[in-house]
Every structure is written in structure tokens, then in C-alpha cells.
A protein has these predicted regions:
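Secretory targeting and sorting signals
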Residues: 1-29
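Extracytoplasmic/secretory-pathway segments with low complexity and glycosylation-like composition
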Residues: 2, 16, 31-35, 48, ...
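Tryptophan-anchored aromatic micro-motifs
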Residues: 31-56, 82, 144-149, 171
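Residues that flank catalytic or metal-binding motifs in active/ligand-binding sites
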Residues: 37, 64, 165-167
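Flexible, membrane-facing loop/turn or short amphipathic-helix motifs
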Residues: 48-57, 110-117, 152-162
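Predominantly extracellular/secreted and cell-surface proteins with exposed
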Residues: 59-130
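Internal, hydrophobic beta-strand segments that form the core of beta-sheet-rich folds
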Residues: 120-155
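Edge beta-strand at a domain terminus
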Residues: 145-175
Length: 175
């Protein structure tokens, strides 16, 4: 006697092979121009879901306005610039056809009890998602989801550990 899971899997595979399970989605080809992201975005880093050294810890929610400008050499490789209304700018790039990255340094990010301060390295990673909130990848979407992660240097403030704050973020195209 076969386990139910094996029989169910065989039936599903057979149904898919003969088309009973319904039509398969059609593939859509994207051009490099459709993959590039350009425009003005509201960027919200969601503080109440922040992790402080891998432990959930409420941080303030932050909102920035970014101007993104990019061009792509292929549908998988893109390069550009992000300019924040907070006064910084950084390289914007994508190497895999879906995920975008921007990195910059945050001066005086980690403050110590003795009055010294250390620079943090902030990395933003994000990808376009279905605007309905499902979280599914959707190239060309005006909504993006991702992470905002800042890491301080090991040894700062007398601690042999990096201070790391990681929080989810959302980008909404506003112009």
C-alpha cells in the first residue's frame, strides 16, 4: 500500500501533463528598459519590525524620499544612482535581474558612552513586488520591498561585536 502523498503527487503530475490542472501562465520577456528603475520614491523603513543584533527591538520608523536613476546593459545588469533627501547619494546596481542594492556610510552612526562615535555601513536591498501586498516578484511594479541594514565596526565602544540594525523597508513610486 502506497502512502497517500505519493499517490496524490502522481495524480497531480498526471493532471498537469494532460492539462486538467488548468492553463500554465505565459512567460513574459522583459527588455532592459523595462527593468531599469527611474523616478522618485517614498522609502519607509519599518522600525517596529527592526532587529537589533538579531533580536526584535522597536526602532523609529524612518521615511525618506529617493530619486533613482538607472540604465541597464542587459535585463540582468543595471547601474545608476540613488539620491536621498537626507543629503547622501550612492551607487545603485543590480546583477541578477531582480534585486537592487545601494550602499553608503553613515558618519557618527554608533555612539559610545565615552562620547566617541563610529561610522556605520548601510546597505539597502530591494526588489519590485506585486502592489496587492502578496510579496510576489513583479518586474515593473511601482512598489518595492526589501531590507535596510546598517552595521557598525567590530570593537566599537569596547564591544567585540558588530552593532547591526536590520529592518524591512518599502518603496512606493511617487513621481
Amino acid at each position: 500500500m502506497r502512502p497517500f502523498g505519493t499517490v496524490a503527487t502522481a495524480m497531480l503530475l498526471a493532471a498537469s501533463a494532460i492539462g486538467i490542472a488548468g492553463p500554465t501562465p505565459t512567460a513574459r520577456a522583459y527588455t532592459k528598459e523595462e527593468v531599469a528603475i527611474n523616478g522618485t520614491y517614498r522609502v519607509t523603513s519599518i522600525g517596529n519590525w527592526a532587529k537589533y543584533n538579531e533580536q526584535y527591538n522597536g526602532e523609529p520608523t524612518t521615511v525618506q524620499t529617493w530619486t533613482l536613476s538607472s540604465t541597464c546593459t542587459t535585463y540582468q545588469e543595471c547601474d545608476g544612482t540613488v539620491k536621498s533627501d537626507e543629503g547622501w547619494s550612492a551607487r545603485l546596481y543590480m546583477l541578477d535581474g531582480t534585486s537592487w542594492y545601494a550602499r553608503h556610510e553613515v558618519p557618527n552612526w554608533e555612539h559610545c558612552q565615552d562620547g566617541t562615535a563610529f561610522t556605520g555601513k548601510q546597505t539597502f536591498s530591494f526588489y519590485p513586488v506585486d502592489p496587492d501586498g502578496s510579496g510576489y516578484l513583479q518586474l515593473g511594479s511601482p512598489v518595492m520591498a526589501g531590507r535596510n541594514k546598517t552595521v557598525g565596526p567590530s570593537g566599537a565602544c569596547g564591544q567585540n561585536q558588530w552593532l547591526t540594525i536590520d529592518m524591512p523597508m518599502r518603496l512606493d513610486k511617487i513621481g
